[in-house]
């Protein structure tokens, strides 16, 4: 199975507001960068979409080390919260409805396809690839051509 590193980030101008995601995929000296902006969304949705879109780039099952500065994404997966929410019909332990269910339903099958290790990195702390993802996400917002985030609540 191929092994690669993925770095992801999401950004939002206002929350909700215009948002974007950026991702960098690194495999044996090769590099792929992806990004997109959206009209009205949230920072957490952009963080999730960065992970989803990066994993969707992979054409076969892979071992992935995924670096994200999103505690929401990393903790939801590594601490198992999302699996509990799904088991309870997308209800959190505090009895409130889980957010971003449409994106979790896209992400979970990708996590079954690939062997993904999530690693949290501190944002804006001189991690070169995380900073590049932030540039991509912010650049996608600034570039215009913003898409509609259909699942934004």
Question: Where are the language model's segments positioned?
Answer:
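RNase H-like nuclease fold core
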Residues: 1-45, 49, 53-62, 77, ...
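RNase H catalytic domain
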Residues: 8-18, 52-132, 136, 141
